[in-house]
């Protein structure tokens, strides 16, 4: 009577070991699959096709009116993510028209998306400009806060040398020379009204 019991016990032990080994294999497979899935998932916050993706957020400027500071922060958040549609919402939220181009463009999101696709880093430029000194300006009876400050001067000769040097982060010597030849700054600039409406992000004359 004892021998059959021993045989059964041995058989049961083998079955238990097989089951245990099989279970371990399944766990390893699941773990490997999970690890593979995790390693292949890119960080959604970083986009290779976004010129501003790896830029740092410019610090808040306490000298700006609160509502202008809020608009600046909203623009920066969207620009750093190349959120063209989000930027377009900010641009069209104001009471007046938004100027994105002097060439008849009427879809800011599509315009910025196309420029980025062509290799023109407009989002990087937008972030860089909003990190530079600004200047309070009055145009058409409206108080505006403009970046860079160079745009707020009457002529290029009035722009202090220090502010000209800061523009080298965005422009090369040839472009800076073109501003001097033209007589004023006509590069990319940003304008926000005292009410916090985003008026323009445009270049040219």
Across the structure, where does each feature detected by a protein language model lie?
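N-terminal, intrinsically disordered, polar/charged segments of Gram-positive cell-envelope systems
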Residues: 10, 32-45
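Repetitive helical segments and hydrophobic/amphipathic motifs
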Residues: 15-16
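Bacterial N-terminal signal peptides that target proteins for export
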Residues: 1-12
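Short helix-adjacent coil turns
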Residues: 74-87
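C-terminal-biased regions
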Residues: 3, 25-29, 42-73, 88-205
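C-terminal motif of bacterial Sec signal peptides marking the signal peptidase cleavage site
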Residues: 19-23
């Amino acid at each position: 009577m004892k021998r059959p019991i021993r045989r059964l016990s041995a058989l049961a032990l083998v079955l238990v070991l097989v089951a245990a080994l099989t279970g371990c294999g399944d766990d390893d497979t699941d773990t490997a699959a999970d690890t593979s899935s995790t390693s292949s998932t890119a960080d959604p916050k970083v986009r290779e096709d976004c010129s501003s993706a790896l830029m740092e957020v410019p610090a808040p400027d306490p000298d700006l009116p609160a509502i202008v500071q809020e608009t600046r922060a909203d623009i920066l958040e969207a620009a750093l993510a190349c959120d063209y549609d989000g930027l377009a919402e900010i641009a069209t939220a104001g009471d007046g028209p938004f100027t994105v181009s002097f060439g008849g463009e009427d879809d800011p999101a599509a315009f910025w998306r196309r420029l980025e696709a062509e290799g023109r880093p407009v989002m990087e430029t937008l972030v860089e400009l909003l990190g530079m000194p600004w200047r309070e300006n009055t145009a058409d009876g409206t108080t505006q806060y403009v970046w860079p400050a160079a745009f707020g001067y009457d002529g290029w000769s009035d722009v202090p040398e220090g502010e000209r040097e800061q523009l080298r982060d965005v422009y090369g010597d040839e472009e800076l020379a073109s501003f001097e030849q033209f007589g004023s700054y006509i590069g990319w600039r940003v304008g926000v009204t005292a009410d916090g409406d985003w008026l323009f992000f445009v270049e040219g004359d």
